């Protein structure tokens, strides 16, 4: 495996590759990046889904103050003490504390109402619809836009794409619980300590390096070249970047593009760099 390298245009494109490698039990390592399901915004989004499905304490602690709801460490400690005394979940403790002095001036009531509303209504909605709605209505995506975190927003868009693909595969049997069980296989994956791993990295990271076998994937319009390209000079820079990626291979170069549709329903087309 150590002779194989998968360069990609942007970090969010690792999701599909990682899923396949994990499913096939092929060890890999990511250079200058974090595994897709280990990224903070992906963990946050999945924690919102878990809160809707089962309201577990770990997910609660992760997203109760994401975005900011003025429920800091001191208030979370109060909830943990109350939950221990009453033998209930942290979310139940918060629900019981909404009207108290300690939580006045916080977003506690709105957070409880948000989770309760989604929990009671999610059975009649697709998982992709629930995910898009909770990220919007919670204010999480708006927070990232305010921060100018485009890469994190791209990662969330890729997560939505993964949910859409899973729904397409499972059909009517795809419930929120089924999806969370499916994604747990990737979030809990253990790659072991072996150094014999496939290398994953961005094309920029690969500059100046060479590898026996290079697998350049996601060669689609809108991905490579990026959909953000608007000028001819920028397109020429993308072309040079594609050339850099292709010339990293010493023995074998494998180029691939993906057919089908994107999450927004648009068709996928091969990259102009393949034609």
Please place each PLM-identified region on the residue numbering:
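Short, surface-exposed connector motifs at secondary-structure boundaries
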Residues: 1-3
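Conserved helicase C-terminal RecA-like lobe
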Residues: 11-26, 39, 46-275
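Conserved RecA-like helicase motor-core motifs
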Residues: 25-35
């Amino acid at each position: 495996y150590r002779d194989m390298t998968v360069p990609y245009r942007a970090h969010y494109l690792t999701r599909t590759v990682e899923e396949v490698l994990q499913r096939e039990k092929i060890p890999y390592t990511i250079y200058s990046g974090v595994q897709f399901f280990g990224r903070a915004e992906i963990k946050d989004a999945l924690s919102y889904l878990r809160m809707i499905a089962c309201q577990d304490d770990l997910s609660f602690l992760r997203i109760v103050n994401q975005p900011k709801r003025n429920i800091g460490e001191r208030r979370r400690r109060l909830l943990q003490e109350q939950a221990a005394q009453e033998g209930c979940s942290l979310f139940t403790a918060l629900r019981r504390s909404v009207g108290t002095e300690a939580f006045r001036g916080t977003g506690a009531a709105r957070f409880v109402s948000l989770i309760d509303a989604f929990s009671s209504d999610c059975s009649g909605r697709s998982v992709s619809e629930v995910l898009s709605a909770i990220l919007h209505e919670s204010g999480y995506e708006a927070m990232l836009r305010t921060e100018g975190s485009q890469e994190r927003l791209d990662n969330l868009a890729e997560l939505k794409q993964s949910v859409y693909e899973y729904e397409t595969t499972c059909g009517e049997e795809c419930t929120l619980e089924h999806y969370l069980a499916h994604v747990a296989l990737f979030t809990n994956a253990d790659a072991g300590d072996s150094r014999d791993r496939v290398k994953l990295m961005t094309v920029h990271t690969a500059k100046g390096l060479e590898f026996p076998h290079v697998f350049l994937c996601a060669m689609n319009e809108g991905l490579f070249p990026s959909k953000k390209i608007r000028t001819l000079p920028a397109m020429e820079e993308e072309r040079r970047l594609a050339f850099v990626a292709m010339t990293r291979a010493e023995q074998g170069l494998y180029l691939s593009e993906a057919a089908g549709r994107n999450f927004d329903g648009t068709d996928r087309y091969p990259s102009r760099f393949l034609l």
